[in-house]
Amino acid sequence: MAEIPTSSNPSDDPETQKLNGNEEDYDHHHDEDPESDDENYEYALQIAEMLPFPMVMQTAIELDLLGIIATAGPDRQLSAAEIAAALPAAGNPDAPAMLDRMLYLLATYSVVTCTAVDGGASGGVVRKYGLAPVAKYFVSNEDGVSLGALISLNQGQAFLASWSKLKEAVLEGGIPFNKVHGMDVFHYQGTDPRFNKIFNKAMYGQSTYIIKKIVRRYKGFENIQRLVDVGGGLGHTLRVITSNYPSIKGINFDLPHVIQHAPTIPGVEHVGGDMFESIPNGDAIFMKCILHDWSDEHCLKTLKNCYKALPRKGKVIVVQMNMIEEPQTTPLAKAISQLDVCLMTQSPGGKERTRREFQTLAEAAGFAEFNPVCHVAGFWVMEFLK
């Protein structure tokens, strides 16, 4: 006969709880919704085991799995075996099974679609995978760019190593990236050619998507004759702007070790320098995702230099995400918060800011007017008017 389990603690007995005056606690415990508690535990499991998703995404980018599916044609789905056959020198007999498990994970995050079909004589099912709507951003487009490079940057060893110093930075101060590499991320670029290449490629990929949308929606480039792009990297942002506004003379301004790799672009002059020292003169100054890399003090120094470089009625066009003052659970809110914490680990005082904080910076730098103009794919285009 099976032994009836008993509690080793008499106070756990319901009747004992009542006798001890704990009836309310007992009732509260047993009133808890079991389904709700299960959902909370399942979510906790997802959090505890979330590392495989970014790692699998990185491997998918390296193997170009999404590109292989895209090459098959619109709305096509491929089995893991078909995808494995398209890999270069795929001599591993277990590759299809491994890819199937990886793609299954990506399907749970809606990166790919999945249809299970009858496996026929082999028994079981065969899963076929296609591209979900978000996947197009991780497949090279007509400009040869994707957000895959941004994944490679964030998953690269230079950035990954920074996270190991986050606890130390919280307790002792300092910037995790600096603790690992002995310098800030921007000077580190000049010492590591491979990292510099990945960084520039990631910035190029993201900028290309965003600036094309901005040029279509934002009309503030009209009547500008000389536009200075501060922190313009290799000049691709100005390439898009000047191709749409040929009358604009573009000045691509960045650190010398960045500018030396910049290609020749019609209508664009590359100028090396330091934005904390001085900025070339222009009718308007453009800055996309620059201020979020720096502390308020550094931003003020840069903005004051912008103010000096502008004529009366000139403007700084700032493109940045805007942090929401109270956390939300939307994909955009999560993306902004994730980037904010990345900046905390990698940049000298960098952070995402609220609209109110941008207005405070603009006013402190001497600008007469702060004007949020339009919202484009998660970014705000804001004008600081002199």
From Swiss-Prot:
Active-site residues (renumbered): 292
Enzyme Commission numbers on file: 2.1.1.-
Sequence positions that bind S-adenosyl-L-homocysteine: 207, 231, 254, 274, 288
Catalytic activity as recorded in UniProt: 4-hydroxy-3,5-dimethoxyphenethylamine + S-adenosyl-L-methionine = mescaline + S-adenosyl-L-homocysteine + H(+); dopamine + S-adenosyl-L-methionine = 4-methoxytyramine + S-adenosyl-L-homocysteine + H(+)
Pfam short name (any one): Dimerisation
UniProt binding sites for S-adenosyl-L-methionine: 254
Activity sensitivity to pH: Optimum pH is 7.5-8.
SUPFAM superfamilies according to UniProt: S-adenosyl-L-methionine-dependent methyltransferases, Winged helix' DNA-binding domain
InterPro entries, A to Z: COMT-like (IPR016461), O_MeTrfase_dom (IPR001077), Plant_O-MeTrfase_dimerisation (IPR012967), SAM-dependent_MTases_sf (IPR029063), WH-like_DNA-bd_sf (IPR036388), WH_DNA-bd_sf (IPR036390)
Record's keyword terms, sorted: Alkaloid metabolism, Methyltransferase, S-adenosyl-L-methionine, Transferase
Gene3D superfamilies: Vaccinia Virus protein VP39, Winged helix-like DNA-binding domain superfamily/Winged helix DNA-binding domain
One of the GO biological process terms: methylation
Principal EC category: transferase
Pathway this chain belongs to: Aromatic compound metabolism; Alkaloid biosynthesis
Temperature dependence: Optimum temperature is 45 degrees Celsius.
UniProt GO MF annotations: O-methyltransferase activity; protein dimerization activity
UniProt tissue specificity: Expressed at high levels in all tissues.
Described purpose of this protein according to its UniProt entry: O-methyltransferase participating in the biosynthesis of natural products derived from phenylethylamine, including mescaline, a natural hallucinogen potentially used in psychotherapeutic treatments. Catalyzes the O-methylation of dopamine, 4-hydroxy-3,5-dimethoxyphenethylamine, 4,5-dihydroxy-3-methoxyphenethylamine and N-methyl-4,5-dihydroxy-3-methoxyphenethylamine. Also involved in the conversion of N-methyl-4-hydroxy-3,5-dimethoxyphenethylamine to N-methylmescaline.
Family from the record: Belongs to the class I-like SAM-binding methyltransferase superfamily. Cation-independent O-methyltransferase family.
Assembly: Homodimer.
Protein name: O-methyltransferase 12
Species annotation: Lophophora williamsii
Phylogenetic lineage: Eukaryota, Viridiplantae, Streptophyta, Embryophyta, Tracheophyta
